[in-house]
Design a protein with these regions (language model features):
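Structural alpha/beta core scaffold segments of enzyme domains
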Residues: 1-376
Length: 376
């Protein structure tokens, strides 16, 4: 029906490549045997509690006998999740068998060989639009290369489904996303988690549609963009918060001098081997796990006898400023200066499991837990 209503139908294919995280610090872990057959593991670990479950499973120990302490990380970007669980389990097994501390540090070559990458995608888009730019229908097919193991492919492709048609109102949508096992390097979580591939394809398509219609790419996005009360392609009604897409696009393009540069640059580029241009793209993204499951986090705020404050959270600092944010929240709620607040290192023996540090969830979920704990 949607394609029947269209004045123009366009089909395009897009591909994205395998990408390495390239964090500055390679994977590293140290395991120390403890009393009663237990073990303590220190490492550059993105998700200490999932790591604890992996180590306990390999060693055949109860969770209470396994302590994971997160060290300061030299980058992660989603890449130090299950890879680090495997490394920590190997170090812990070595410590258990020898009764001595064991340390493992990957070389850069070992890191490149062993770690998972961003999923390469092949994508086919079909879009129907009216002459005024209004989208009437979209059909999307995506194929992700999972490599030899499933890893996070199920959830990465789920996220691609959500993002496939961008921040635009499209009433008639069909999206199919698949992940295929191959003999390539396996793929998993990387910053954006299935969104960058879809955003690249959809925003490239929007530019091509604008070109075919002889329409300004900004205007095409303004015609179709989300606003308050809009319904996404997956049925999510945007009615419980401010939807500022069009305002952001308007202000960004005004600040960039969009119209003036669009008029000037083609003239300036005449006869030049190297040409200059101006482009724009839109996206939308939620915080926390969303429809992937019920989300929760916990925190402990302990006020000492001298009025200083200790803050404990099960969410791990990955370089995003978590320690500062949580400390600021506690200081604000308790009415103390920031220098009176100390954020304690993530240690599975002293803090509650608050789920993984993924999906831009730490500030909104962990920060809310710190705020509530401080209030109480």
């Amino acid at each position: 029906q949607g394609f029947a209503q269209a004045d123009m139908i366009l089909e395009r294919d897009y591909t994205t490549q395998l990408i390495e995280h390239a964090y500055i610090e390679p994977e590293a872990a140290a395991a120390v045997p403890g009393p009663g057959g237990g073990v303590t593991v220190y490492g550059s670990i993105q998700n200490p509690f999932s790591c604890r479950r992996a180590v306990a499973g390999v060693l055949g120990l109860p969770l209470a006998r396994v302590r994971i302490v997160q060290s300061h990380m030299g980058g992660s970007f989603g890449g130090k999740d299950e890879v680090m669980s495997a490394m920590c389990a190997r170090a812990a097994l070595g410590a258990q068998l020898t009764g001595r501390p064991v340390k493992i540090v990957n070389t850069r070559e070992e890191s490149l060989v062993e770690s998972y990458k961003r999923h390469p995608y092949k994508m086919h888009y079909k879009i129907g639009v009216r002459r005024d730019g209004r989208i009437t229908a979209m059909e999307v097919r995506m194929l992700a290369d999972a490599g030899g193991y499933a890893s996070q492919s199920l959830f990465v492709t789920w996220r691609s489904t959500v993002q496939a048609t961008g921040p635009y109102v499209v009433e008639n949508v069909k999206t199919d996303v698949y992940a295929a096992f191959t003999n390539n390097t396996y793929t998993g979580a990387m910053r954006g988690f299935g969104s960058p591939q879809a955003i690249f394809a959809n925003e490239s398509l929007m530019d091509e549609v604008a070109l075919e219609l002889g329409m300004d790419p900004v205007q095409l996005r303004m015609v179709n963009g989300f606003e308050g009360g809009s319904v996404t392609a997956t049925g999510h009604k945007l009615d419980e918060h401010t939807v500022s897409l069009k305002e952001v696009v308007r202000k960004a393009t005004e600040a960039a001098g969009w119209e003036a540069k669009r008029a000037r640059l083609p003239v300036e580029n005449q006869g030049r081997a190297k040409k200059r241009g101006i482009g724009m793209a839109c996206s939308f993204r939620g915080c926390a796990l969303g429809a992937e499951g019920v989300d929760a986090a916990a925190a402990i705020v302990s006020v000492q006898t001298d009025g200083s404050v200790l803050v404990f959270s099960g969410l791990a600092e990955n370089g995003q400023g978590l320690k500062t944010i949580f400390s600021q929240i506690a200081a604000t709620e308790l009415g103390v200066t920031l220098d009176r607040v100390v954020f304690m290192e993530t240690d599975t023996s002293t803090v509650p499991d608050s789920g993984p540090t993924v999906a831009s969830r730490s500030t909104i979920m962990g920060g809310s837990a710190v705020r509530i704990a401080a209030q109480k």
